Amino acid sequence: MGKNYAESAKLIDKSTLYSSEEAMNLVVKTSKANFDETIDLAVRLGVDPRHADQQVRGAIILPHGTGKKVKVLVFAKGEKAKEAEAAGADFVGAEELVEKIQKENWFDYDVVVATPDMMGVVGRLGRVLGPKGLMPNPKSGTVTFDVAKALNDIKAGKVEYRVDKTAIIHVVIGKKSFGPEKLKDNFRVLMDAIIKAKPSAAKGQYLKSVSVSSTMGPGVKINPSKVLD
């Protein structure tokens, strides 16, 4: 690891579970790269994601957004395609875009939205979009006829969270330049949503561990029992 990482790591006590306020101060202080580092949240949950009734997923609009310009692909036709273009979609199309993705392995976008009538066509992409977390889904509001609202929400800083195979949720909560206060606001809104999404089938401790880190910096552990303090 580089000199910056080593210096940053000295500021963090690995055995300490910090409050969210302390953690946001530390993650900003230990972000020393010469670019605006992204701040990531990792939450390990007490669920078994192999069971359908222990899935945790959803979407929430972060009060301060993510600081990232999000490219959106919309599968729609006719009036809905025009609506998507007017609302600022980066790419709009139908079968021709499905072919482009299949033939060219084209993934130059961050979010995919589809109108329900297009899902028969988009379904053919399940194998390629699914593993990348790009498959449109009604639960996260990305399968909808209200494409303008979906686009506005995404551009306003809507993030999707989803537990992975190892029972961890990884989400971006902002940039170093946001400063501790805005990062804390985003963190709390997201943690509140994750707590409310607890499956009834999940037994025992739900929040196993919570940590934040910058792109090039060390992780900072947060006390799971005080995430909303």
Curated annotation (Swiss-Prot):
One of its GO terms (cellular component) is large ribosomal subunit. One of its GO terms (biological process) is regulation of translation. Keywords: Repressor, Ribonucleoprotein, Ribosomal protein, RNA-binding, rRNA-binding, Translation regulation, tRNA-binding. GO terms for molecular function: rRNA binding; structural constituent of ribosome; tRNA binding. Pfam families: Ribosomal_L1. The keyword Repressor applies. InterPro entries: Ribosom_uL1_bac-type (IPR005878), Ribosomal_uL1 (IPR002143), Ribosomal_uL1-like (IPR023674), Ribosomal_uL1/biogenesis (IPR028364), Ribosomal_uL1_3-a/b-sand (IPR016095), Ribosomal_uL1_CS (IPR023673). Gene3D superfamilies: 3.30.190.20, 3.40.50.790. Coiled coil: none annotated. Transmembrane segments: none annotated. NCBIfam families: rplA_bact. Part of the 50S ribosomal subunit. Belongs to the universal ribosomal protein uL1 family. Binds directly to 23S rRNA. The L1 stalk is quite mobile in the ribosome, and is involved in E site tRNA release. Protein L1 is also a translational repressor protein, it controls the translation of the L11 operon by binding to its mRNA. PANTHER family: 54S RIBOSOMAL PROTEIN L1, MITOCHONDRIAL (PTHR36427), LARGE RIBOSOMAL SUBUNIT PROTEIN UL1M (PTHR36427:SF3). This is Large ribosomal subunit protein uL1. It comes from Clostridium tetani (strain Massachusetts / E88). The lineage of its organism: Bacteria, Bacillati, Bacillota, Clostridia, Eubacteriales.
